[in-house]
Amino acid sequence: MSLWDKAVPVGERCILELPLNYTKHDHDVLDKIFRVANNMKNNLISWYDRQLTEMTRTRAWRDNQKSLSNLYSEYADDVEDLEKGKQRIAKKKENAKKKKKTFYLSRKDKEQLRYLQSRVKEFEEKRKDLYEIRNEMIHRYGFSKFDFEKQMNKYRKSYGTLVGIDVAQKIAYSVWDMFQAVLYGKGKSISFSPFSKFLAIEGKKNGANITFNKDKMTVTLGMKSNKIRMRVKKNRKDPYGYETEALSRRVCYCRIIRKAYPKGWRYFLQLVLEGPPPVKVNPETGELLHSMGKGRVGLDIGPQTLAFSADKEVGLEELAEGVQLAQNEIRRIKGSMDRSRKNSNPKMFTADGQVVRKNKLPAECLNCRGQRIWVKTNRYKKMEILLRSLYRKQAALRKHLHRRMTNRLLAMGDEFYVEDMRWKALAKRAKETKRTKKGKILSKKRYGKSIANKAPAMFLSILEQKVVASGGSFQWIITWKAKASQFSHETGKCNKKKLSQRWHYLADGTKVQRDIYSAFLIQHTNKNLESFNLRTCAKDFPAFLKMHQKEIERLQSLDKRMPSSMGIKKAA
C-alpha cells in the first residue's frame, strides 16, 4: 500500500524473513527480474520527471505558485497571532480553574479574536481556490495514481513476462510516493534508482505473481517461461516457537529481497503476515523469554551513549559497541578504492587530487551524453562488492545490538521516559563560522558520523515499539523545558554546563556522572513531562548514588577504549 493512500486501512502486521534454496538458473532469473524491475522504475521516473519539468515551466503554474507565496506572506502574521492568542486564552482558563475563579474575556480581546478569526477564514478560502487550480493542473499532467499504473503497464509489456502486473504496480506506487513528496510534502528532487540499491520486489496479495505455499514450503515467482519455483528453508529446531507461530498467520503478501555478500547477491523471502509479531516463549518454563518488568525507567541518550536509571539498576553504555570495528574496515576499503580510481583515471583528477570539472575534461573522458567514463579495474570491482557486503553486515549488527539492549531495558520497568531529541539537526554542520583566539577557523562538524554509526533514533523506535507492544508506556519529555542536563534536584534550579563538563557536583562535593544523573532526573519526571518531582528525587537519591558508584567502578575496571563523552578514566 502506498504511504499516501490514506483511505485504505491497514491492520497490525509483522514480517518473517526466510532464506531461499535456489539453483544457479533460479539465481540468474532472479537477477534478471530485479534488473528489469529497476529499469522499469527508472523509465517511469524519467517520464514523470519530464512531465514535472514541463508543468512547472508553464506560466499558469508559476503564477499560481507566486499567488500562493504572496498569500502566505500576507496572512502569516495573522495566522500566527491567532494561534498564540488561543494558547494564551487556554493558559488563562487553566490558571483560573486552578484558582477556582470564573474566567472572563475582555472586550478588547474578544474584538481582536473575532478580527483574527475572520482574517484566517478569508485566508483559508483564498488558499482553497488556489490549491484547487494547482491540483487541477497536477491531474491534467497525469500525476494521479491510476496514470502511474497505466504508464508502468506500458513498460511492463515491453519486457514480456518477466515482471507481473502486481509487482509492476507496487513499483509504480513507490515512484508515485516520490512525486507526491515533491508536490505535496518536503521532497525537493527526484533521484534515479541505482541497481545496487534496488533491493526488493513485492506483490499485492499472496495469490498472484509472488506466491507462497505453506504446505509445500515453496515460493513461486514470475510468469510463463520465466516462472520459477524455489524451496523455502525453515528452522527445524525453532527453540522458541517463533517461526511456527508466525507461519500459522494469514499471509498478506510476499516480498523477495536481496542482500550483498562477498561472493555476490543472495535472495530471501519476506512474508508480510497478519497480526502483531509473535512472542518468544521459553519451552522449559512456558514464560515469555523477554518479559516486561515493573517501575519507571529514565533514559538519557546521546549520539554515542545511553544512560539509564531504574529502581534497581543504573548504567552507562556505548550504543552498538561493535559497529565501529566494521566502520574502520569500511574506511580502509574506501581509501583503497579512492587510490585505485585515481591511478586508473589520471585525467579525471588534478595534481592535488581534486576532481576535474566536466567542461575542462578531454573528449575521450566523456561519452556521447556528456557523462564521465570511469575506468574500473577488476580489483576495484571486487572491492565494490566487498564494501556493499560490509555495509550490510554493519547494518545487521547494529540492529541486532539495538534489539539486545532493548530486551535488557524491557526487564527493568514498564514506564519509560526519554528526552525528545532532534537528531537531524544534531547531524547537520554548523552554519556559523567560528574562530579561535589565534584566528584559526574551527571545524563546522557536529555529530553526523556518530549518529550515522550508532543510529540512536533507530534504537528509540525499536524500544518504543517493544514497550507499547508489551503493554507499557513510552513518554517523550519536553527537553527544552525540563533541561535535565542543567538541573539540580538539590537547589531546584538550572545551572548551565559546558559540553565538555561530564560530571555534576553536589553541594557536599560528591560528583555524579552527568548522563547518568540526567537519566535519574528523567526517571522522576512529573505528569506534565516538563518538570521533575523534587520530593521523589530526594527520597530515591541515596539508593541511586550507591548504584551509580558501583557502575562507575565497573566502567573504570573495563580494559577497553570508551567514548570521551562518558568522561570515564581507567583506574590506575
Segments and roles (model prediction):
Residues 68-262, 448-449, 453:
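Acidic carboxylate diad motif detector
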Residues 44, 170-178, 182, 516-526:
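Stable alpha-helical structural segments in soluble proteins, enriched in small hydrophobic residues
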Residues 57-70, 189-209, 353-362, 485, ...:
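Amphipathic alpha-helical surface "interface" segments used
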Residues 2-167, 345, 349-362, 375, ...:
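Long, compositionally biased intrinsically disordered regions
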Residues 14-20, 226-236, 314-317:
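Generic detection of short hydrophobic beta-strand segments and adjacent strand-loop junctions
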Residues 13, 216-220, 227, 264-270, ...:
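A generic structural signal for beta-strand entry/edge sites
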Residues 4-5, 267-572:
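Positively charged, helix-rich recognition surfaces that bind polyanionic ligands
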